A protein has these predicted regions:
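Membrane-proximal stem/loop segments at transmembrane-domain junctions that anchor or position
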Residues: 1-88
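Short coil/turn helix-boundary motifs
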Residues: 52-53, 129-131, 155
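Membrane-interface anchor segments at the N-terminal boundary of transmembrane helices
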Residues: 60-139
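Hydrophobic/aromatic-rich transmembrane helices and adjacent perimembrane loops
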Residues: 109-113, 156-176
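Transmembrane alpha-helical segments
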Residues: 116-126, 144, 167-179
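Transmembrane-helix signature of polytopic, lipid-linked glycan biosynthesis machinery
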Residues: 125-126, 142-157
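Membrane-interface junctions at the ends of membrane-embedded or membrane-associated helices
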Residues: 126-135, 171-205
Length: 205
């Protein structure tokens, strides 16, 4: 998977490219020989990256973006390419190839940009509020490890969907800090709204 993750593919840099299967077949289905060939490929690829810095930056930049900034995380595609026992109705066709799918992709994209910003802000608030402990930094550390792993090994946007979900608690903490922060004054504004008597209380008075 490391050999595959460091090479080009038809989909995006570092995605599935069949290298591991080819090495296994060329080695006569000998796992040890295929593994040795994979390490030879990896060393050769690392040397190439070292001699071509601009290419390396372009390769890994595209690999990161193709995995983490694909808003549907292949959730629609993975269903579309499967065989369907029943004929698709207008909803299914609209989701796969029509305006319904486009709408959800726009919605997911907006949601993910907000989540990424809020997650980064959440980490910032954890440090400035001195709330860093094993409970609060565990999920960010898991995500950091996942980022490093998928940076090097075979990539795919659906692989990182699990880690997107793990961003939500830290992002939620950011919203909590913003809503209750002294700079936004949102909490103060909401408090004043609660002090305004409603119509029923006025009639009783």
């Amino acid at each position: 998977y490391l050999d595959a993750g460091l090479n080009e593919s038809a989909m995006a840099p570092g995605w599935y490219n069949g290298i591991a299967l080819d090495d296994y077949k060329n080695a006569g289905l000998d796992a040890k020989a295929a593994n040795a060939q994979a390490w030879t490929n990896i060393k050769s690829r690392m040397n190439y990256f070292g001699k071509n810095t601009n290419y390396m930056i372009d390769f890994f930049s595209k690999k990161i973006i193709s995995q983490w900034n694909e808003p549907t995380y292949e959730s629609i595609w993975v269903s579309k390419v499967k065989s369907h026992t029943n004929e698709l109705n207008w909803i299914g066709n609209g989701m796969y190839d029509g305006s319904i799918g486009q709408f959800f992709e726009l919605y997911f994209n907006f949601y993910m940009q907000i989540l990424f910003i809020a997650f980064a802000a959440g980490i910032y608030f954890l440090f400035i509020n001195r709330k860093t402990n094993i409970e609060t930094v565990l999920l960010p550390l898991v995500i950091l490890g996942a980022f490093g792993y998928h940076l090097l090994f075979e990539g795919k946007s659906q692989y990182v969907l699990t880690y997107i979900i793990l961003m939500i608690p830290t992002a939620s903490f950011a919203f909590e800090c913003i809503l209750n922060g002294k700079y936004t004054k949102i909490k103060e504004f909401v408090g004043k709204l609660k002090e305004i008597p409603d119509g029923k209380e006025s009639e009783k008075a």
